[in-house]
């Protein structure tokens, strides 16, 4: 039996298209996206993560199929590198050059490596997975709904859904 595997950004994008998840809103953020090596170069999944976050405000110099590794690929994360040649710091400097305040990622290893690299180069950027950016929107929307639906006793009607309602 063959199993079809999807990246979470593909599932989120599908659910957004079907109206089961909200469309992306940047809420004042300027966003760039770091393409994970396997996602972009091997999986050719370039559009879904960008769609989920409402597009990018500025691409890094090397992006898409030509993206540069975060430094975790091939188990690099656990190897010692020369202090002046750390891959994650090189990549972080490229990301910081975009001038964006947020970098979206689609891989937990990339998240760790990019955060560490940005700290090392002194860049003040937030690193969030595409799903975390969407989650922020859902929470903000639900708080807005909560405020609008308070009844006279001050209690709120809570909207609930489960994953089975979405797929």
Role assignments for model-derived ranges:
Residues 1-167:
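Iron-sulfur cluster-binding electron-transfer modules in prokaryotic oxidoreductases
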């Amino acid at each position: 039996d063959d199993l079809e595997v999807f990246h979470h950004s593909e599932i989120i994008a599908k659910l957004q298209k079907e109206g089961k998840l909200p469309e992306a809103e940047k809420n004042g953020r300027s966003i760039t996206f770091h393409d994970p090596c396997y996602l972009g170069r091997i999986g050719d999944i370039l559009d879904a993560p960008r769609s989920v976050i409402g597009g990018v405000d500025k691409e890094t110099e090397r992006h898409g199929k030509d993206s540069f590794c975060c430094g975790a690929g091939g188990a690099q994360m656990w190897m010692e590198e020369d202090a002046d040649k750390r891959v994650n710091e090189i990549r972080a400097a490229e990301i910081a050059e975009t001038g964006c305040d947020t970098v979206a990622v689609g891989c937990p290893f990339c998240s760790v490596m990019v955060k560490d690299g940005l700290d090392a180069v002194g860049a003040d950027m937030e690193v969030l997975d595409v799903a975390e950016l969407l989650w922020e929107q859902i929470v903000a929307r639900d708080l807005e709904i909560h405020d609008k639906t308070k009844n006279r006793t001050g209690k709120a009607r809570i909207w609930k859904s489960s994953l089975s309602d979405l797929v």
